[in-house]
Amino acid sequence: MTTEKTVVFVSGATGFIALHVVDDLLKTGYKVIGSGRSQEKNDGLLKKFKSNPNLSMEIVEDIAAPNAFDKVFQKHGKEIKVVLHIASPVHFNTTDFEKDLLIPAVNGTKSILEAIKNYAADTVEKVVITSSVAALASPGDMKDTSFVVNEESWNKDTWESCQANAVSAYCGSKKFAEKTAWDFLEENQSSIKFTLSTINPGFVFGPQLFADSLRNGINSSSAIIANLVSYKLGDNFYNYSGPFIDVRDVSKAHLLAFEKPECAGQRLFLCEDMFCSQEALDILNEEFPQLKGKIATGEPGSGSTFLTKNCCKCDNRKTKNLLGFQFNKFRDCIVDTASQLLEVQSKS
């Protein structure tokens, strides 16, 4: 696939991960059509990218609405070669998990694939869907020290059992949305020509592409680091844990997922290593003199023991071999994330 002016559609283009992806696409020479939920959001994004002539935006107010992406593909279907479906509902402030998490995630995936089939079946060659480690393992599995997460594993929760709480329902939504995509591919092989890959990242940390995005709220993973910076000395904190990956590596993987033929048909499990909040606190206290003595310390040095006793194992050697690049280390990622956060706070 030639880079020069290949048209890539990016759903949810105004999001944390998607902004990095859009930036990498433009720098690599692709033409990008993105979607956002409102004209205001779209105009804001275009302004941030200085009205780049290779970037345009379309409105998709609700990805879960019937035929949500039809207008986009009716208008641009004959030029779009690659689709990166990054948009997904992520919120935990609900008690109707089926209505607010499960159904929107599944319908969003279904609607974009149906739109490709109906209006761009002869044009779209590659589809990459942003899934999650949550599709690979249930919350219970993530805390099982004998469990190994890899590219072949699946979250074992059912549609019913995942509705025990908001976190389980979100994890379930990622599983069922991804399964919808693979099932669609199998059921429609005779009427489509695109290959499918999924990106399955763990907790995604790293700096915002545009620092001022921090003033408009941040993604749930980045909020973990923001909260650690705001905790006072002696405060208790929740010791989050799981696989982590740098947002800049997630972005790079989205491009390689459609550029490298060997990534077609693959689930790419993005994990540099396991992390816990205690390890992040240790880094913050070690690397930022202005925070030392002011923020929580927890039990310095206890992170690795905590992970050994409370976390599953990750094996993504297959993904690393397919992608062929080194992921950013946790320390570098946390330092970059916190540096940006502190700089923005100092100016507000």
Swiss-Prot record:
Keywords: Oxidoreductase, Phosphoprotein
Top-level enzyme category: oxidoreductase
Phosphoserine: modified positions: S339
GO MF annotation terms: aldehyde dehydrogenase (NAD+) activity; carbonyl reductase (NADPH) activity; oxidoreductase activity, acting on CH-OH group of donors; oxidoreductase activity, acting on the CH-OH group of donors, NAD or NADP as acceptor
Residue numbers binding NADP(+): K41, Y170
Pfam assignment, any one: Epimerase
Top-level taxon in the UniProt lineage: Eukaryota
Note: Present with 2340 molecules/cell in log phase SD medium.
Similarity comment: Belongs to the NAD(P)-dependent epimerase/dehydratase family. Dihydroflavonol-4-reductase subfamily.
EC number annotated for this UniProt entry: 1.1.1.-
Record-given protein name: Putative uncharacterized oxidoreductase YGL039W
GO BP terms, alphabetized: ketone metabolic process; response to furfural
This protein's GO CC annotations: cytoplasm
Species for this entry: Saccharomyces cerevisiae (strain ATCC 204508 / S288c)
InterPro entries, per the entry: Epimerase_deHydtase, NAD(P)-bd_dom_sf, NAD(P)_dehydrat-like
